[in-house]
Amino acid sequence: MKFTLINEIIQHFKGDAVVVFSNSNTVFNDDNIQQLIKLNHFDSKPGKVLLLNLVSGFKSKQVIVSGLGDAPISAKNYVKALNAVIVILVEIKAKNLMVQHVGIKGFNELWVHEITAKVMCNATYKVQKVGNYKKQNSGIERITIQSTMDSVYGLMKGQAIADGMSLTRHLGDLPSNVCTPSYLAGTAISLAQEFNLECEVLEEVDMEKLGMGSLLAVSKGSSEPPKLISLSYRGNGNEKPIVLVGKGVTFDSGGISLKPGTGMDEMKYDMCGAASVLGVMRVIAQIKPNINLVVVLPAVENMPAHNASKPGDVVKSMSGKTIEILNTDAEGRLILCDALTYVKKFNPEVVIDIATLTGAVVVALGKYNSGLMSNDKNLANDIISASKVSLDGVWQLPIEDEYDELLQSNFADMANIGGSSEAGSITAGCFLSRFTQGYRWAHLDIAGTAWVSGDKKGATGRPVSLLTQFIMDQVQKRL
């Protein structure tokens, strides 16, 4: 799919189709289109589309009218309109089309280009059956966007983000017998070779030498060897890097604290944090900003076995702090805490961990916003700002002493869960915060946003867009 910009009257475009937009107050400025909208009782609601054939005055074969809802046009309604358009374009097998320029309140034209490319590329992603993997092809070959600008940077960035999201979704959708810790390591190595990045993979023996007793307590019940994967992009000399840590539990049975059987197949998605940081690295490696980025993936499988960790076991983390494992199904924090200690070697500017960490965040925030926690107000505000630009929402949750005290243990420095069923997402974040001394840190709980269930089951690619925007915002701050 190729994107171009052109300053041309849309009626003059010769192609398979053109896309125009309509909202509750105004319709596309063409008498024939306005009459056809009235005749078809088109109400311009977001997500509604009207397909018109051989419209007088248009050189394209078909015209697609997409609703934008009430004025002023919102970014979210524009995204809904684009997603609806893609469905029609695929149905009519359009190869060459033009999209009308639309002004979005609060955003500039570069952003419109970026979001258009990102949404239209991402909307064509298809979940593929195992053993029948093919290069994604929607049939759409060229999309021309009406614009008075010459810069294609927004288009390039949007396509790169969609490419990173596609990698994240593909990894998440793979079955856990394919996407193992070793598979994630292989993917990182392939990215390093493709984009000339630095890659290091620590094996179990290396982690034992480093004293990662918490991480290894999770992997010990599985026949799949654990991996600690790091991938580095250097775009700005010796500047302190942004470090992203992605939880990579390639399958989470719960361990000895076994999960219920219903829906357990979806626990292959417990590595979506790791998948997302690989997706972000793919984006950054293509955009090539002047910044340093390191992504770290603690990758394990959590399984029950005769040698698996048991409730009540006490383990020693890389930090030297001891942890009482009250629930082996609260394993994500056990691998992340050692990774958060390990990343100090990179002398980070900031560290953000991304994890499908708690079911409690789904209860609190549903599938719309990822949970955000941070030990630094400015960092949290930067992430919130990036979420608004990227339309990849977050909602901040507190870190306070009252919640942290719930992790008290009589037998270790801390327990891996709180003493009650309350505030599960917050106590998980408090647990992680105990391992982040010495650097600015934020935590994204993506358990509700990383994938969807039901008939359209599949990974979403979130929060690749958010993290990319955050990184690019940091680049701008340093200019």
UniProtKB/Swiss-Prot annotation:
It is found in: Cytoplasm. Mn(2+) 1 binds at residues 252, 329, 331. It comes from the Bacteria. Mn(2+) 2 binds at residues 247, 252, 270, 331. PROSITE patterns: CYTOSOL_AP. The gene is pepA. GO terms for cellular component: cytoplasm. Keywords: Aminopeptidase, Cytoplasm, Hydrolase, Manganese, Metal-binding, Protease. One of its GO terms (molecular function) is manganese ion binding. Its cofactor is Mn(2+). This is Probable cytosol aminopeptidase. Belongs to the peptidase M17 family. Presumably involved in the processing and regular turnover of intracellular proteins. Catalyzes the removal of unsubstituted N-terminal amino acids from various peptides. Binds 2 manganese ions per subunit. Its EC number is 3.4.11.1, 3.4.11.10. The active site is at residues 259, 333. One of its GO terms (biological process) is proteolysis. It catalyses: Release of an N-terminal amino acid, Xaa-|-Yaa-, in which Xaa is preferably Leu, but may be other amino acids including Pro although not Arg or Lys, and Yaa may be Pro. Amino acid amides and methyl esters are also readily hydrolyzed, but rates on arylamides are exceedingly low; Release of an N-terminal amino acid, preferentially leucine, but not glutamic or aspartic acids. Gene3D superfamilies: Leucine Aminopeptidase, subunit E, domain 1, Zn peptidases.
